[in-house]
From Swiss-Prot:
One Gene Ontology cellular component: cytosol
Binding site for ATP: 15, 174-175, 216-222
GO MF term (any one): ATP binding
EC number(s) recorded for this UniProt protein: 2.7.2.11
The protein's role, per its UniProt record: Catalyzes the transfer of a phosphate group to glutamate to form L-glutamate 5-phosphate.
Gene behind the chain: proB
Name of this protein: Glutamate 5-kinase
Cellular compartments annotated: Cytoplasm
Keywords: Amino-acid biosynthesis, ATP-binding, Cytoplasm, Kinase, Nucleotide-binding, Proline biosynthesis, Transferase
Principal EC category: transferase
Gene Ontology biological-process entries: L-proline biosynthetic process
Keyword flag Cytoplasm: yes
UniProt catalytic activity: L-glutamate + ATP = L-glutamyl 5-phosphate + ADP
């Protein structure tokens, strides 16, 4: 089923989590970004349009400055994101250029999705970029996001983007193969749920874990993202971004993953 969905989908949103994007020491994983860009270039060559939702601005800021990492003051966090966003986009631009692909940046807040004028402007920008062969790269605008207007996690941001753009598929790349009935990092007998059609029924059967190391979204936010896009009949795949060839393996039906969908 994964292969069928991948091949039938023309408009694909791919979300990259902080844990996927970072090395163990918190620095940007350039090998991963290069592998990602190569696979996106393949998908574009197959006639698909791709939008990337990326996390990682804060860890990129910490990596670049090597300070402030333990300061919890909001101003410091936002300053790190301002520094790191430049580093992050520079990395994407450099690696995509190896494949002849240009990128465009969109930094968004919750208000952008729920204000009619802003919503329309984002839609028009996205459609124009992809129609011209550009890969849009989206992140939350952390430097202006306060509690009242922030989305809070990029799983939700990716889900909002997929519905706004009328995507055919949302792919979340995390540091696990998909949804398990219990935490695979703690239990060797954890079983992967390959297909989920009813999220409420699934929640009765699994144990939901904690937030991850570098990011703001744990399993709960990924499940909620699936719920959001499934309402619009958009399937969602949760796969392991630590597998550098994950997109190709999904395309070739060789990867472990969980797909959420509605009949």
């Amino acid at each position: 089923m994964l292969q069928d969905v991948m091949k039938k989908s023309k408009k694909i949103v791919i979300k990259i989590g902080s844990n996927t994007l970072s090395n163990v020491d918190g620095t940007i994983n350039h090998d991963f970004i290069e592998a990602l860009c190569q696979q996106v270039a393949f998908l574009v060559g197959e006639g698909k349009q791709v939008v990337i939702v990326t996390s990682g601005a804060r860890i990129a800021g910490i990596s670049r400055t090597n300070k402030w990492s333990r300061k919890e003051d909001m101003n410091y966090k936002q300053a790190l994101c301002a520094i790191g966003q430049v580093e992050l986009m520079s990395a994407y631009n450099s690696h995509f250029s190896h494949h002849g692909i240009y990128i465009g940046q969109l930094l968004l807040t919750r208000e952008d999705f729920f204000d009619k004028t802003r919503n329309l402007n984002i839609r028009n920008t996205l459609f124009t970029l992809v129609d011209e062969g550009i890969v849009p790269i989206i992140n939350e605008n952390d430097t202006v996001s306060v509690e009242q207007i922030k989305i809070g996690d990029n799983d939700t941001l990716a889900a909002y983007t997929a519905t706004l753009w009328n995507a055919d598929l949302l792919i979340l790349l995390s540091d696990i193969d998909g949804i398990y009935n219990k935490n695979p990092k703690e239990y060797e007998d954890a079983e992967l749920l390959e297909q989920v059609q009813n999220i409420d029924d699934m929640l009765k059967e699994i144990e939901v874990g904690e937030t991850n190391s570098f990011g703001t979204g744990g399993i709960e936010t990924k499940i909620e993202a699936a719920r959001i896009v499934n309402r619009y009949n958009i399937p969602m795949i949760l796969g392991n971004g630590k597998n550098k060839e994950i997109l190709m393996k999904l395309y070739q039906n060789e990867a472990k993953a969980t797909i959420f969908f509605r009949e």
